[in-house]
């Protein structure tokens, strides 16, 4: 299984990825920022596609070895995400568009609705 967490910069993708990792034994996190730093990639469309290709190849390798893979990566174009996600046996896309991650919150019914 591959979880693909996407969203804007600083939206909590990596935080969520590591929270999931703590709950899923044998899972591996691929952080887009860390991987980008390995190859000193730019941000042109060409560089972004190449970056996603590398992440996808690493994720496929890990998935093939039986790991659950959690990708935390800015992936701005839906077409690109869909193309790369088709290469996995099973995947789930998690979008974080607003830059918010709520933790340890409880839902309370509005007054009069209980």
Predicted regions and their residues:
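Small-molecule kinase domains that catalyze NTP-dependent phosphoryl transfer to phosphate-bearing small molecules
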Residues: 96-114
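The conserved Walker
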Residues: 8-9, 14
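Conserved substrate/cofactor phosphate-moiety recognition/catalytic segment
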Residues: 14-65
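Glycine-rich phosphate-binding loop used to anchor ATP phosphates in small-molecule kinases
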Residues: 44-101
